[in-house]
Regions:
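Catalytic glycan-binding domains that act on GlcNAc-containing polysaccharides
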Residues: 24-200
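Hydrophobic membrane-insertion alpha-helices, especially the h-region
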Residues: 9-26
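N-terminal Lys/Arg-rich, disordered targeting/topogenic segments
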Residues: 1-6
């Protein structure tokens, strides 16, 4: 009799524990997702994606690769969520119709995301919509991409991630591409109403 009561209590306890796990699982998954794949400024990202005809998951992925949504200044002087260098930001400000530009503007998320999205669109346009080339230029610079393209052309091979000579830039492009897919699948409301291509 005592053994049956213990068994019944054990079964009841296991049922309660299983119920708690089942009920808590979505919350735990969401917490893990938010820690490993953070997302903030969704409305700003979506707004700039719409203006620049970009995949919002691409913008989020660049922010993730650059700062994981924790804006800071890099050792090279790049600033803000999308790590834009002041000289690049000044070029972008003038090109996009800005009249006054201050380096401190880059600390403001709305301005930083606007310039970063504008720069991504500019690079995509420069490289015929090729995201690999645009991301390589975003991280490694357009001069280096021109050199890598020339080397691939001289060798009569198609340009791929493997042709990127800087290991950091090669890893960056791969990280952004992975994160872009993750943002699209983990945050469906981020990309809702958008096509998945940023080619223009």
């Amino acid at each position: 009799m005592l053994k049956r009561r213990r068994t019944a209590r054990t079964v009841a306890l296991l049922v309660v524990l299983a119920s708690v796990v089942v009920l808590a699982l979505p919350t735990v998954k969401r917490i893990v997702r938010d820690l490993t794949l953070p997302l903030a400024y969704t409305s700003l990202i979506r707004q700039q994606a719409r203006i620049e005809h970009l995949d919002p998951a691409l913008i989020a992925a660049v922010i993730f690769a650059e700062t994981k949504f924790d804006a800071r200044t890099s050792p090279t002087g790049a600033l803000g969520l999308m790590q834009i260098e002041p000289a690049t930001a000044e070029f972008l400000a003038h090109r996009s119709g800005g009249v006054a530009f201050e380096v401190s503007d880059l600390a403001e998320p709305g301005i930083n995301i606007r310039y970063g999205a504008y720069y991504l669109r500019y690079l995509l346009d420069q490289y015929g919509g090729n995201e690999t080339l645009a991301l390589a230029a975003y991280n490694g610079g357009q001069t280096n991409v021109a050199d890598w393209l020339a080397q691939a052309h001289a060798a009569r091979v198609r340009f791929t991630i493997a042709a990127i000579r800087f290991p950091q830039t090669r890893a960056y492009v791969a990280r952004v591409e992975r994160a872009q897919h993750s943002y699209a699948s983990e945050y469906p409301r981020l990309v809702s109403g958008f096509t998945t291509s940023s080619s223009g």
